């Protein structure tokens, strides 16, 4: 008994190492999507995969991916912006791609959580009262309370990811203001990063926002419907592995992508491979179901209402996106920080991969808009 007690620190350390190694996938040396080296950044003892392209003295840009994908989803943007002289980074958010995926309830994961300090001193900060939100019609507003804390206190949340973005920009990107380009739910992490640390960023270019239809503030009659939703979420977390195994196959992934992608030719073998391979790594399925249980956190209209006015936001989106109400996106132009909203007819949820010939010029125009004044004058 005494020997076991004395060895306890060593046993705990060994167990931590085992957990870190087991839930830290090894990426290929070269990304098959971009032909760029996969690089690793150690963040809070976690592995974060990222890619970089373009001259290091170029204006820095960070690409932030959306739900269940990874930095390879920016394959056409990373290289397109780099060819124009920008220093471009694309990151795998913690829990996605080839970044670490420890179990959400492990001590290792809990230590990383971005909610730890944010709500520690005042629990009342975890709920925003009477927040105006948009409607699918784009007309009028609904007033809702917004729960900010993850319902099961998972560390895989927007506050954690926003802190990762900021730490990455401070520690990896050359010390210059960074422009964020984001897709889908990557928008929420990106907006939060700028809200929390505005001096580090020039602005945000949004390629399709996400209104998070599973959020408790977005679901109709939440007092009645949320208990049912959370029961389903709990069942998926606990017993969803067979369903995940059935869906995590190349042909199934290809079929699933046909819903958000309206430009079907963009769904090639490389896309299927680079999205599926990391999802087959240890711990990935648990992160998928954990994310589907995330019915709280910030919402884009709430964030844009408190966004720094001197940090421009431009938005583009596909009008054929089945998940994003176009009129509600158009209404975001009424937020003071939003300078431009551009619809792309016939494009789906992933315009950067479906129509890079339209999206890359839009991003490049935004990058010129936010270029530091002294650099503009020097040109």
Describe each model-derived feature in a short phrase.
Residues 48-59:
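Short beta-strand-to-loop junctions in surface cap/lid or active-site-entrance loops
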Residues 66-76, 88:
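Serine-hydrolase catalytic-loop signature spanning alpha/beta hydrolases and amidase-signature enzymes
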Residues 58, 66-69, 184-185:
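Active-site glycine-rich loops that stabilize anionic/oxyanionic intermediates
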Residues 306-347:
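Conserved loop-alpha-helix segment in the C-terminal half of the alpha/beta-hydrolase fold
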Residues 188-191, 195, 200-240:
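Flexible "cap/lid" loop of the alpha/beta hydrolase fold
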Residues 37-44, 51, 93-181, 361:
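Active-site loop/oxyanion-hole signature of alpha/beta-hydrolase fold enzymes
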Residues 337-379:
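Catalytic active-site module of serine/aspartate enzymes centered on a nucleophile-bearing elbow/loop
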Residues 216, 240-307:
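Conserved alpha/beta-hydrolase catalytic His-Asp/Glu region
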């Amino acid at each position: 008994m005494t020997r076991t007690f004395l060895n306890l620190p060593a046993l705990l350390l060994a167990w931590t190492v085992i957990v870190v190694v087991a839930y830290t996938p090894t990426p290929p040396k070269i990304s098959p999507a971009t032909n760029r080296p996969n690089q690793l950044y150690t963040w809070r003892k976690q592995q974060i995969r990222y890619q970089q392209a373009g001259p290091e003295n170029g204006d820095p840009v960070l690409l932030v991916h959306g739900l269940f994908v990874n930095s390879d989803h920016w394959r056409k943007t990373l290289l397109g912006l780099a060819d124009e002289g920008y220093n471009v980074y694309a990151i795998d958010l913690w829990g996605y791609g080839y970044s670490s995926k420890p179990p959400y309830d492990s001590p290792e994961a809990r230590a990383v959580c971005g909610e730890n300090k944010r709500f520690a001193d005042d629990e009342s900060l975890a709920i925003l009262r009477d927040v105006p939100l948009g409607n699918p019609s784009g007309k009028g507003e609904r007033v809702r309370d917004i729960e900010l804390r993850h319902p099961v206190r998972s560390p895989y949340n927007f506050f954690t990811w926003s802190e990762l973005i900021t730490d990455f920009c401070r520690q990896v990107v050359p010390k210059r203001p960074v422009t964020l380009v984001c897709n889908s739910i990557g928008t929420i992490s990106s907006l939060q990063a700028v809200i929390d640390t505005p001096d580090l960023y020039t602005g945000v270019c949004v390629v399709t926002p996400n209104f998070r239809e599973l959020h408790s503030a977005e679901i109709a009659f939440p007092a009645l419907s949320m208990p049912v939703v959370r029961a389903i979420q709990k069942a998926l977390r606990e017993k969803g592995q067979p369903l995940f195994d059935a869906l995590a196959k190349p042909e199934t992934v290809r079929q699933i992508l046909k819903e958000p992608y309206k430009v079907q030719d963009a769904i090639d073998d490389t896309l299927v491979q680079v999205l599926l391979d990391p999802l087959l790594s240890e711990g990935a399925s648990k992160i998928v179901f954990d994310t589907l249980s995330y019915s709280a956190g910030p919402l884009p209209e709430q964030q844009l209402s408190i966004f720094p006015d001197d940090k421009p936001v431009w938005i583009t989106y596909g009008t054929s996106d089945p998940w994003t109400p176009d009129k509600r996106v158009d209404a975001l132009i009424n937020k003071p920080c939003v300078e431009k909203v551009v619809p792309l007819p016939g494009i789906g949820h992933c315009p950067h991969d479906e129509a890079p010939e339209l999206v890359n010029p839009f991003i490049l125009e935004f990058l010129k808009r936010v270029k530091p004044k002294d650099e503009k004058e020097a040109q």
